Amino acid sequence: GWGGRFNPIHTMLATGTDAVAGRHDKAGLRYADDMVTMPLQCGTQWDGLGHIFYGETMWNGYDARLVDSTGAKKHGIHKARAGMIGRGVLLDIPRYRGGDYLEEGYGIGNADLDGCAKAQGVKIKPGDFVIVRTGQMEHCLARGDWGTYAAGDAPGLRFETAEWIHRNKIAAICCDTWGCEVRPNESTEAFQPWHWIVIPMIGIWMGEIFYLQDLAAVCARDTVYEFLFC
């Protein structure tokens, strides 16, 4: 996959076959053991402030070299492990537009975000955790094929929404797609250009590959689109 990412690999280190074959007899204990090898971005995850660099710096002007082979000396996502809590708001864009999911390549603009919030009767406030549903994940699950979900064409946020994020002073933006922003990207001169602005310039945490089907169903049933995010 992109960036050397791959699906989780499950490896058996010891099995019942080993036990029956006598491979464990010397230790006197017969057992099964295993391990999983996986990139941390192969599933639901947060893009921390040390994930994207603009030139040679990250958010707040820190040198990109502060993220090295030993980890992040600045802006590691672990710093937020006890503080990622606040008012969550779901913006269900396909439901607002009258469908089950958005087509690949559909760019969600500021008008979509504002229109959806108004239709749902919810107001975006500073510090909110805004969760944008496209329905792409559910569409893949329903057809039984992930296709090019990882780094392929996808509905997502347009470049202009960086201004919306900054203006509304939200704490984080989340989505049910691989990379939140629309793909193909709006510019052919930069890969994931929205990331370049939102993380290292605005300083926003970004949640990706969020499973939203159940949350969306409950919000629609109750006609309540705000909740405790933690």
Regions found by a protein language model. Give the residues of each.
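Active-/binding-site microenvironments in catalytic and ligand-binding cores
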Residues: 1-230
